[in-house]
A protein has these predicted regions:
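N-terminal Sec-pathway targeting helices
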Residues: 2-18
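Second-shell loop/turn segments in exported
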Residues: 34-39, 49-53, 74-82, 96-108, ...
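Extracellular/periplasmic catalytic domains that process cell-envelope and extracellular macromolecules
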Residues: 55-59, 79, 130-132
């Protein structure tokens, strides 16, 4: 009986160690444990988008949802190929502005350039009479040429893992509730 209880105790210890290491790993990937994160107040972001998006012919709710989907409003978000709150690549950035790409971490500038890029994509879709917001979301997420290759059919695109993008692809224009004043 002593041997069996020692094995059980060891097994519980290994399970506890595994769960502890898993929790630490999960939390280190959590946005609240990112020491370089710069989460911008949702009211500030919403006010900027609400004012400027309509001037560019964009729905503010859609733009706000893209910001959340791309970075959870983290002005310092960075992947291997994209920067800032709207996670713009250098190619997308350069297509719509002459500003240096190093300014992509300034959240206001990033949102302005991101909206210019969305306006550009919208114009490209309108030029072939294919504009709708699910297509705009798909072309922002995967690239205009990827959408064109699939004959502008969003249903043929890879289903995004991101919940917000899944809702945008399905036609929901405002999957993220903007803050109240």
């Amino acid at each position: 009986m002593g041997y069996f209880s020692n094995v059980m105790r060891l097994g519980r210890g290994i399970v506890f160690l595994f769960l502890t290491l898993w929790a630490i790993g999960w939390m280190s990937g959590c946005k609240y444990f990112d020491p370089d994160a710069n989460f911008i107040d949702d009211h500030k972001v919403w006010e900027k988008i609400k004012k400027e998006a309509p001037e560019l012919g964009l729905d503010p709710n859609f733009v706000y949802a893209i910001c959340h989907a791309e970075s959870s409003l983290n002005g310092n978000a960075q992947s291997s190929i994209a920067r800032g709150m709207m996670q713009l690549t250098e190619a997308a950035w350069s297509a719509v502005t002459n500003l240096h790409y190093r300014t992509a971490f300034q959240w206001e500038t990033n949102v302005e350039v991101g909206m210019l890029y969305l306006k550009r994509l919208k114009g490209m879709l309108e030029s072939v009479d294919m504009f709708n917001y699910p297509r705009l979301a798909a072309s922002y997420r995967y690239g205009y040429n990827a959408l064109r290759k699939e004959q502008y059919m969003v249903s043929r695109m890879k289903t995004p893992i991101n919940r917000i993008y899944r809702k945008l692809f399905a036609g929901q224009l405002s999957p993220v509730e903007p803050p109240e004043n």
